Amino acid sequence: MKTTFLDFEQPIAELEAKIEELRFVQDDSAVDISEEIERLSKKSQQLTKDLYANLTPWQVSQIARHPQRPYTLDYVSELFTDFHELHGDRAFADDQSIVGGLARFNGHACMVIGHQKGRDTKERAARNFGMPRPEGYRKAERLMRVAEKFGLPIFTFVDTPGAYPGVGAEERGQSEAIGHNLYVMAELKTPIIATVIGEGGSGGALAIAVADTVMMLQFSTYSVISPEGCASILWKSAAKAPEAAEALGLTAHRLKALGLIDKIVNEPLGGAHRDPKGMAALLRRALGDSLRQFQGMSVDALRERRFERLMAYGKFKETTPRA
């Protein structure tokens, strides 16, 4: 698949187009231009390194939404074996914006749950662009209860603009479904490892991200609102999205510094979409390390650790004013 370049990547796109053109010429010519191709390839690689070393939060937001970025099912196929998808919330419907099922990770039985956006127009519509309805969150909760019953660790993958705000979703109890998931995940008797792989949009993300370990991919985002939504409220214009992204502090490095996530998983040069298999290998190592941390831990110790972790959020210290 041909790589889609974002607006700020146009200098890289122009170099790559030139390299592709030279390769095409070389195939039909007796002239050896391999040295020139190699020179331009190195130049493109260095340009990518320089560009990605100085990304703004708004640019990171664009990468997190890249249409070729790996989604949950892509990671499932690379990281897990014997995946058996489970459907429905046993109450209303099967929401395809959340996928989940039984699988094996490095030989260990587990439960996998995650948002799924879809690649083409038809699939995006079927999966509601990765925006779950209440039945999606209730399906996730049902699968978590199954995992708890059989003592299976839970891996969740977060990638959503947010919970679906439609009238039908509200009528069926969207806020209740999200709130109930937060409650359930806080007291589950099995390890939970959450990874933000793309967009982490507000409560729609949090509903499957209350975990013992929360990781973020290097160019993913996690915030209470999208930059465009924030800009529309504060500045009455979505054009202020870059400023809003800066103010929201939605990048992995910012959230790690604040103690809101536990680990950042580095991405291949140019982002996960440039090397999905390489990204999967890096993520496999990080997930394995996290799982080993909880193996052998008693249920009481696991829940106590999770409780203390959650209670540590938002802590503050009162001080007396200086005279």
UniProtKB/Swiss-Prot annotation:
Record localization: Cytoplasm
Boundaries of every CoA carboxyltransferase C-terminal domain copy: 39-293
An individual GO BP term: malonyl-CoA biosynthetic process
Pfam families the record matches: ACCA
Signal sequence region: none
Keyword terms of this UniProt record: ATP-binding, Cytoplasm, Fatty acid biosynthesis, Fatty acid metabolism, Lipid biosynthesis, Lipid metabolism, Nucleotide-binding, Transferase
GO terms assigned for molecular function: acetyl-CoA carboxylase activity; ATP binding; carboxyl- or carbamoyltransferase activity
TM regions (residue ranges): none
Catalyzed reactions: N(6)-carboxybiotinyl-L-lysyl-[protein] + acetyl-CoA = N(6)-biotinyl-L-lysyl-[protein] + malonyl-CoA
Enzyme class: transferase
A single cellular component GO annotation: acetyl-CoA carboxylase complex
E.C. numbers: 2.1.3.15
Pathway involvement of the protein, from the record: Lipid metabolism; malonyl-CoA biosynthesis; malonyl-CoA from acetyl-CoA: step 1/1
Role summary: Component of the acetyl coenzyme A carboxylase (ACC) complex. First, biotin carboxylase catalyzes the carboxylation of biotin on its carrier protein (BCCP) and then the CO(2) group is transferred by the carboxyltransferase to acetyl-CoA to form malonyl-CoA.
Assembly notes: Acetyl-CoA carboxylase is a heterohexamer composed of biotin carboxyl carrier protein (AccB), biotin carboxylase (AccC) and two subunits each of ACCase subunit alpha (AccA) and ACCase subunit beta (AccD).
Family label: Belongs to the AccA family.
The name this protein goes by in its record: Acetyl-coenzyme A carboxylase carboxyl transferase subunit alpha
